[in-house]
Amino acid sequence: YEIPFGDEIHLTIIAVLLTWFTWAALFTIVMNEFYKFVTLNNIVKFFSVPVLILDIVLFDIYATGIVGKNAFASGDSRLICLAIETVIALSLALSNILVGDKRLPTKREVLTLLGTLPFAILPIMPPYVPQALFGYLDQSVKIEDLTEAHRFVIYLGFIIPVLIFLYYKDKSYEVKRFAMIYLMVAMTWAFIEHYSFDTLSEPWSWPLHLCNTAMFIVPLCLIFRMNKLFTFCLFINVMGALLAMVLANTFDNAMETGSISYWINHYAAFFMPVLLVALKIFKRPGFKEWVWAVVSFAAYFFSMLFVNAWFSNYDAGVDFFFLNSDFIAEKLGNWAIHTRDITVSFTFRGLVFTFYPLYQTLFFIG
């Protein structure tokens, strides 16, 4: 991979910030079409519009940062897509301003805008931003094995939702629901940056890990008020994400894109369902809902058993929910590793399906 701007660090910083802020600008413009809040509208007016104008003025830097060093020389079709996207978004924002309330914000609204803007921008930060702006951390900094840095990151996973709860607990239901939709969809947008259109042609690369599914299920539950599906997130995703945070499976540098994406995913999967109940957006489920969640988990579990065995024929590294490797077993000791010695295999139409009945049964029961 060739760095678009080489040693010209200032251009890299401009391109990274433009891309990040453009994500936020596009997102707020879209949200403003569905939810009518004064603060959101002011963000579109005084943040999103200026950012999109900057995109046009600095289009060579903006486009090169996204498409690559030879974007203009190669005539990449993405340049046209970026230009169309920018013009449509800017036109949409300006049209709303022209037909809407043209008054200037009050002093109180300005203060609210300034206080809200950082929190509107941060959740949608592309995972590569820390690495692009600050580089790698020292390799001695490990966010795994419960090191000091790892514990700090875990503590943040508890502190952040508490702060969000304290801020929103006395707000109206509609404000709380909108804020949580905004937060969850923004984090999902940032999370899927890790994937590309090529991923669609490789099902074994799809985000089918248990915690990955939360990034798509929770927004659906929020937007379409899917109460039954939400119980799956609350009972299953939360516990799975907590275990994943403690048994962190990150091999990248702590500042690398993959690591940041990992924590965006698991923070959201861990605290968002709990936060939604605490804020009374969803009711606290009872025993009946718990039974439904267990049945849903069983369906997911056995589906992943089959999917792992099937897709391993195309990629030996397939390991959805860690059912296909010794990642969990080695954390528990030799006795757990040896449970994988018992295997059952069969061949169907040239494909080999391998299962670990003892290990996978104990995994399910546990």
Regions found by a protein language model. Name each.
Residues 4-10, 137-146, 163-175, 188-201, ...:
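Short juxtamembrane and helix-loop transition motifs at transmembrane-helix boundaries
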Residues 9-16, 73-86, 136-156, 290-294, ...:
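Membrane-interface transmembrane-helix boundary segments in multi-pass integral membrane proteins
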Residues 18-30, 81-98, 116, 152-165, ...:
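Hydrophobic cores of alpha-helical transmembrane segments in multi-pass inner/ER membrane proteins
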Residues 37-51, 105-113, 173-184, 228-234, ...:
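Membrane-interfacial loop-to-transmembrane alpha-helix junctions, especially the N-terminal start
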Residues 50-62, 117-127, 185-195, 237-249, ...:
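Aromatic-anchored segments of alpha-helical transmembrane domains
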Residues 63-76, 195-205, 224-228, 248-261:
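Membrane-interface helix caps and helix-loop-helix hairpins in membrane proteins
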Residues 150-156, 180, 199-211, 234:
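Structural signature of hydrophobic alpha-helical transmembrane segments
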Residues 251-301:
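A contiguous pocket-lining binding segment that forms or flanks enzyme active sites
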